Amino acid sequence: MMILVTGGARSGKSRHAEALIGDAPQVLYIATSQILDDEMAARIQHHKDGRPAHWRTAECWRHLDTLITADLAPDDAILLECITTMVTNLLFALGGENDPEQWDYAAMERAIDDEIQILIAACQRCPAKVVLVTNEVGMGIVPENRLARHFRDIAGRVNQRLAAAADEVWLVVSGIGVKIK
């Protein structure tokens, strides 16, 4: 079962996603963040400290089909957090050292879509419950710079693809989860 949990920043998405995992005997938490500064390190540690001790953590943001496999048991669970961070990492990996003003966003989106299609296929083959957390980025103002606009657009389309493929979709607002699919 593939479940998508979306919402704004600090909306309670993580807590809601963790509740959806329930009491699965084996949980793999896939963290897509990269530790780039002390603040991010502290945020990641805060999340780790709040998880049950038996949860395993894998830090990975690419080739997720190597972790989400058909070998898992049906009562196991995977929590992947977060899709928008994965999209950010992919954008910057694809852009390399080039100026973001010169990036070919259409080609980058195709490459990101390929990665998302592989992720969806892995989730659909996996017998375990897979909960994906993402940020709802399309409810705010139009960003003023090109990179931010393209990120918002790409992340929004990624979320649409994931929602279409998911068995359930939850929107979390102010700590309250609303099932929308």
Swiss-Prot record:
Its EC number is 2.7.1.156, 2.7.7.62. GTP binds at residues 7-14, 31-33, 48-51, 59, 81. GO terms for biological process: cobalamin biosynthetic process. Changing H46A: 3-5 fold reduction in activity. It comes from the Bacteria. It catalyses: adenosylcob(III)inamide + GTP = adenosylcob(III)inamide phosphate + GDP + H(+); adenosylcob(III)inamide + ATP = adenosylcob(III)inamide phosphate + ADP + H(+); adenosylcob(III)inamide phosphate + GTP + H(+) = adenosylcob(III)inamide-GDP + diphosphate. InterPro entries: CobU/CobP, P-loop_NTPase. The keyword Transcription does not apply. Catalyzes ATP-dependent phosphorylation of adenosylcobinamide and addition of GMP to adenosylcobinamide phosphate. Homotrimer. This is Bifunctional adenosylcobalamin biosynthesis protein CobU. It comes from Salmonella typhimurium (strain LT2 / SGSC1412 / ATCC 700720).
